[in-house]
Amino acid sequence: MKALKRVIRMLLHTFLWPWRKAYRRRNGVAVQEERHELPNDAFLGLVGEKLAEGHTAVIWVKGYSMRPFIEFGRDRVKLAPFDELKVGDAVVAQIAPGHYVLHRIIQRDGERLTLQGDGNVRGVEHCLCGDVCGVVTEYIRPGRTLLASDKRLQRRIRLWRWLRPIRRYLLWLYRECI
């Protein structure tokens, strides 16, 4: 069992999270920055207004629903206004009055979008294209910035969507091994 766990951990690190391992090798000590947390409904409402004006915003991620691609307390994302939305894009959307989520589009049917977090096994949210505040253009990690349009990242996202039936077990291994 230990050998199997070790092999799976190696495969997960190789295909999904190589930047995390490289960061640990470069910097032995992680520095915790001081942050102030605001309620999502107030903060993301203001961010949505600025994005509607054409500005961009960088926000810290809260929660574990986008794990393993975005980690709570470690990663930030750069949000920007969008021209078009496609399946696979990570977006900030208002799914109910005052309730915002940062999730990935898994299905599009005209103006209706279906969203799901990468770390969610079940449960989806529905919204309209007009409810989307902004789209993620960059993933900012300590020591590295990844563009959302990066081909390697896009392949990993497609692979993760394809592995949806066994996602529960992969997430369990991720939590146990990391």
Residue positions per predicted region:
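Extended hydrophobic leader/signal-anchor segments used for secretion and membrane insertion
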Residues: 1-178
